[in-house]
């Protein structure tokens, strides 16, 4: 009996949290995140402020959960998870036209597919959140990507972190300028950036190998 009651309570918690997150995303179709209020989200979700605070401390906490969800969805659909970051870039170079790269969208890095699901795209289209999301993505991906760049390019952790931040921020800004819509222009830009990133990594690796690092 206790297990049954706990199960019902768990479902109720999930339902309420989903209602809050859906309400926030719905409101962001009309206004930026910084202009939202807890009262407004509660009204849209048809819950009380007390109910909101029983699940979240702030709207920032709701936002973090949504970004995590978007990242997990994108990561789950990846077909190149077993590859290191440099390996993936080299692998993608074989798809040398917009049409072919589009067919292999699932091979792109997670950060390039994080806004593929329409439900979450509004988060990334909000320019007031750009710095916040870029920093969060950097922290999420740093533990796996930075060591791979260090090993491949024969550089220090600090150098690899700066390089990854540069690549992530640049790609994010290009995506934002295209409103995160994956049309022909997006894939053409992605293809060009992919070539620049790969050539850069290869040049640094070659220089350091030649110098005996």
Segments from the language model and where they lie:
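Hydrophobic alpha-helical connector segments
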Residues: 79-119
